[in-house]
Amino acid sequence: MGRRIAVVLFNLGGPDTGNDVQPFLKNLFRDPAIIRAPLPVRWLVARLISTLRAPVVKQNYAMMDAGGGSPLLRETKKQADALQAELAKKLPGDEVRCFIAMRYWHPFTEEAAAEVQKWGADEVVLLPLYPQFSTTTTGSSLSAWHKAYKGKSRTICCYPFEENFVSAHVDQIMAAWERAGRPGNVNLLLSAHGLPESVVKSGDPYQWQCEALAEMIAGRVPADWEVSVCYQSRVGPMKWIGPPTEEEIARISDQGRNILIAPIAFVSEHIETLVELGEEYRLVAEKHGAASYTRVEALGVHPGFISTLTGEVLAALGMKETIRSCAGGRLCPSGWSGCPQAELKQKAGVRITETAG
Ligand SMILES: C=CC1=C(C)c2cc3[nH]c(cc4nc(cc5[nH]c(cc1n2)c(C)c5CCC(=O)O)C(CCC(=O)O)=C4C)c(C)c3C=C
Ligand SMILES: [Fe+2]
Ligand SMILES: [Fe+2]
């Protein structure tokens, strides 16, 4: 008899309705991976920020959905179904089931862990829907998982340089350019979620993974395009990595260029892509005189993305080779023995035959 293989897809989660916005934000700001303060302070800060932020954020959720909720779970379910179908083809002798574990709203990681336990999985593969590794996202999700689930598992760290992943991005970008009427004088902005600078300084590989991915994408789009990386969704008073997406849009729009803007750290449509990239930054571009502004869609169920995820799961099961795209060492959840980050930066994108663990 074949194995029961559970694949757990991790993402941040989002409110189901407008009433969930404040408690969702409170969960987010209570996370020590997001607010690095000791407990009583963190809980107070979480209550304060979530209360202050909720009214504005509620309006943004309401722009996407009449009920005021996030499309993230719906989009993640589509990805889970597509991945499960692909894995069923690749592993015909086994039973594969995809589970969804959200960090700050339903289905919570604890709920997913209980489901996996109940199902009686023989193998558990942990798959973050965050292509780049950050302690604030993947790291936080995995620690919640290990608190909730006591069995063994195999962990995928990150996959920003996987061939199918890079080409899926290029494909989405070129499709958006076609839709925009193939303009000339293009500036492609590759926008990632920002991080506080202190997080990067403490060893988080997220920023260099975003920037190395951006270089790979830049190498495959028309040579006369300007390409730059920028960081969106800054929250709070700390210093964040930059340049900020909004400032880049203003700078480029002032030159009257055609802007294409693509998300490179989000793989599903949600508030940051539909509202921030789709609506708020469009107004900035218009105000500063951009010739045009076109938002590139998130990867969603793009076949290249689903095959990236399929390949990562097979690699985690020891059935395929993959790219080692992370820094290894202290932060790496896959348990790679690690080598100096600088050496790995050079190696990024080099196909190797070692498997994780
Ligand atoms: C204050 C700190 C935050 C850090 C650091 C952060 C990192 C980070 N987040 C994502 C992906 C997503 N973030 C989403 C929502 C969201 N994130 C923060 C704050 C931080 N994120 C807040 C306060 C919110 C809520 C919305 C808001 O108040 O603006 C979402 C889900 C949104 C949805 O539609 O449901 C995702 C996905 C990444 C990739 C990342 C760093 C690597
Ligand atoms: Fe976020
Ligand atoms: Fe890693």
Curated annotation (Swiss-Prot):
One of its GO terms (molecular function) is metal ion binding. InterPro entries: Ferrochelatase, Ferrochelatase_AS, Ferrochelatase_C, Ferrochelatase_N. GO terms for biological process: heme biosynthetic process. It comes from the Bacteria. Fe cation binds at residues 193, 272. SUPFAM superfamilies: Chelatase. GO terms for cellular component: cytoplasm. Keywords: Cytoplasm, Heme biosynthesis, Iron, Lyase, Metal-binding, Porphyrin biosynthesis. Pathway: Porphyrin-containing compound metabolism; protoheme biosynthesis; protoheme from protoporphyrin-IX: step 1/1. CDD domains: Ferrochelatase_C, Ferrochelatase_N. NCBIfam families: hemH. Gene3D superfamilies: 3.40.50.1400. Its EC number is 4.98.1.1. This is Ferrochelatase. Catalyzes the ferrous insertion into protoporphyrin IX. HAMAP family: Ferrochelatase (MF_00323). Belongs to the ferrochelatase family. It comes from Hyphomonas neptunium (strain ATCC 15444). It is an enzyme of class 4 (lyase). It catalyses: heme b + 2 H(+) = protoporphyrin IX + Fe(2+). It is found in: Cytoplasm.
